[in-house]
Each structure stands twice: as structure tokens, then as C-alpha cells.
Design a protein with these regions (language model features):
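Short glycine-rich or small-residue beta-strand-to-loop segments that form or flank ligand, phosphate
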Residues: 12, 43-47, 81-86, 301
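Glycine-rich anion-binding loops and their surrounding alpha/beta cores
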Residues: 2-3, 7-10, 17, 62-68, ...
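Acidic, glycine-rich active-site loops and adjacent beta-strand->loop/helix elements
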Residues: 84-89, 114-120, 159, 225-227
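N-terminal glycine-rich anion-binding loops that anchor highly charged ligand groups
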Residues: 1-3, 9-57, 65-74, 293
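N-terminal small/glycine-rich loop or linker at the start of catalytic domains
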Residues: 2-14, 79-85, 111
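A glycine-rich phosphate/pyrophosphate-binding beta-strand-loop-alpha-helix module
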Residues: 43, 93-149
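Short amphipathic alpha-helical face segments that pack within enzyme cores
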Residues: 41, 98-102, 293, 297-300
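Active-site cofactor/substrate anionic-group-binding motifs, chiefly glycine-
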Residues: 50-114
């Protein structure tokens, strides 16, 4: 019996694994060392007692190591992602992805990592593709797009081939596992900042602790009154990370300089509908609720990357870029260059 197999047996007996032990087991999973029954038993045992932050961080670490290389110089820095865990079942427009495009138009380098929809009607990949940005760019082409436009989309299926070992298990279990949590933590790009939304407020501290292991300069973990976004219908619970230091506070729409809306005001549809709604916002003809929700999320990206001193300042900067057409024209540039690189 290998050491990883012995450690897996400990987890099945209810032992909470240290981060190094958990890395050992998850690394073995990425290498195909366990069969589906062993993987299912392990994931079920973790979920039954509750995944420990060290185990969440370990799973993310193992799958980042196993990911396809994204050839962006690690020492160059300045990359950010804005992403949510999903699971809030609210059916909103793709706020995070839209906000990534706003931030890119303002000089931020956004390496957006995402996948197709699983439980929602429109995943980040579905929206990006519908907007006209191809998903088949090579890692080298994605770096080129990032350098020239400040945006690239890293399609999770392309960068995480090791997920093939757990995909059948996840489909068969039909229950949440640690893999529902690590999607936002396994971006293959060398991030220095991140905005991470969680759909379950109970995950705020665990995800903040896991993110603290990623050696980021600045990050926000947010839960907005039932959404994995900054809320405009109620308060948002925030965990702000600067290095390994975590600060907790509450944020209201008024503090952002925005009005309040209902969750129903933010509901979208499938990727085609959401693309139309988001394009309308960028063209100055969209709904105010959509515009303000996107601006709030973009403000968080501007804040963690040092492009805004406060979240409220970031909101105003984002709103101005939307209003004056900067975002719409920049999206056209991204689409054009991405298609050229894909050809």
C-alpha cells in the first residue's frame, strides 16, 4: 500500500488531514492512482464531516500543479481573476464575467478562469463564447491576448485534464464535494489578486483561509445576501485579505454610492440572453440594475489591483467607462484579436 493510499484510509476513518497529507492524496488522484470507488469514498468522507480549509487548499494546490502550464512570467505579476463558487441558484446575469471585461478596459490584466454551466443556465465559458471570444486559444495565444487587451479566458476543461479522474465520480454522486469549492482556486495563471464570491455564507471564512494559502497580494471573498456576488439588494459580507491577514466587515449598496434593487432585477437567462443584456449595458442601453451590479463587481477588481483606492471610487470609475463607451469598444477589440489568434 502506498503512503497516499494509507493516508486516504485515515481520512475514511474520520481523521482530519493536514495540508501536506491532503496534498499527497489529491496529487495521487491527479495521477490516476485511485479507482472511482476509492475517490468516491474519500470525497464522501470529507463532505460528511465538512471539508477543512487545509484540505480545500490542498486540493486546489494539487490540481494547480497538475494543470496545463500557462506561460505567463510568474515574476511579472499584476494578474487578477473575479469568480464565484456558484450554487446560489439565483439565475442572475453573468456579473463576474461582465465585470472582468470592464476591468480589462481600464488597464487591469484579467486572466478569467471558468467553465461551462453545470447547474446554472449560463456559465462563464458559455457567455464568453456567445460574445464572440473563442474558447480554443492555445496557452501561448491566450498570453498574447492578455498582453494586448488585458483579458484572456482560460477554459477550465482545457487546463485541467486531471479532472477526468473525478468527473465520473462527481456525476454519479450528485452531491456537493470539495470540487464544488476549488474551481475558483485553481486558476492556472500566476495571480496576484482575486475577487471570489461564495454562494453559502458559511464558506466565507473557509474560502478566505484557503485563499490565504495562494500567496496573493490582495483579495476579497464576498457573500451578498444569498448571492456569490456583491449585493445591491442587501448587505454583503466581506473577508479582505492582504497577504495572510484577513479582515471581516459588512458592505452596503449605499457605501458604494449605489441604489438598491431586488434579486429579480438581476435575473437573466441562457448565454444568448445574458450576452444580449450585458452588451446592452455596455452600449448604454441596458437596465440600471445590471449596470450597477456589474460596476460593483468591477469596483472590487479595481480595488484589489490598486486601480482604485476605495470600492466607491472603483464604482464611479467603472460607471464612467461604461457610459463613455470605453467598455463596448474594448470588448470589440478583444473579440477581434481573439478571433485572429484562433484562426
Amino acid at each position: 500500500m502506498s503512503q497516499a493510499a494509507a493516508t486516504l484510509r485515515e481520512a475514511l476513518n474520520g481523521v482530519v488531514l493536514s495540508q501536506s497529507q491532503a496534498v499527497e492524496v489529491f496529487a495521487a488522484i491527479t495521477n490516476g492512482e485511485f479507482n472511482e470507488i476509492e475517490i468516491a469514498a474519500f470525497l464522501g468522507a470529507l463532505h460528511a464531516r465538512g471539508e477543512d480549509p487545509a484540505e480545500i487548499a490542498a486540493a486546489a494546490q494539487a490540481f494547480r500543479v497538475a494543470a496545463v502550464n500557462f506561460p505567463y512570467p510568474k515574476g511579472q505579476g499584476g494578474l487578477v481573476d473575479v469568480v464565484g463558487t456558484g450554487g446560489d441558484r439565483a439565475g442572475t446575469i453573468n456579473i463576474s464575467t461582465a465585470s472582468a471585461l470592464v476591468a480589462a478596459s481600464l488597464g487591469v490584466k484579467v486572466a478569467k478562469h471558468g467553465n461551462r454551466a453545470v447547474s446554472s443556465r449560463s456559465g462563464a465559458a458559455d457567455l464568453v463564447e456567445t460574445l464572440g471570444i473563442p474558447l480554443d486559444l492555445s496557452p501561448q495565444a491566450s498570453v498574447q491576448l492578455l498582453e494586448s487587451t488585458g483579458f484572456c479566458f482560460l477554459f477550465a476543461q482545457k487546463y485541467h485534464p486531471a479532472m477526468r479522474y473525478v468527473a465520473p465520480v462527481r456525476a454519479a454522486l450528485k452531491n456537493p464535494t470539495v470540487f464544488n469549492l476549488i474551481g475558483p482556486l485553481v486558476n492556472p495563471a500566476p495571480l496576484s489578486a482575486q475577487v471570489l464570491g461564495v454562494g453559502n455564507p458559511a464558506l466565507l471564512d473557509d474560502m478566505a483561509s484557503a485563499l490565504a494559502s495562494a500567496n496573493l497580494d490582495h483579495a476579497l471573498v464576498v457573500h451578498g445576501s444569498g448571492l456569490d456576488e456583491i449585493a445591491l439588494h442587501g448587505p454583503t459580507q466581506v473577508r479582505e485579505l492582504r497577504g495572510a491577514e484577513i479582515t471581516a466587515y459588512e458592505l452596503t449598496p449605499a457605501q458604494l454610492g449605489l441604489g438598491t434593487y431586488t434579486v429579480a432585477d438581476l435575473v437573466g437567462g441562457d448565454a444568448s440572453v445574458n450576452a444580449q443584456l450585458i452588451r446592452a449595458v455596455f452600449d448604454g442601453a441596458g437596465q440600471a440594475a445590471h449596470r450597477d451590479a456589474i460596476a460593483a463587481s468591477a469596483a472590487a477588481v479595481l480595488y484589489v489591483t490598486g486601480k482604485a483606492d476605495t470600492l466607491a471610487q472603483g464604482v464611479q470609475t467603472a460607471l464612467e467607462a461604461i457610459a463613455n463607451g470605453t467598455v463596448a469598444s474594448h470588448l470589440d477589440k478583444i473579440v477581434t484579436q481573439a478571433r485572429e489568434l484562433s484562426a
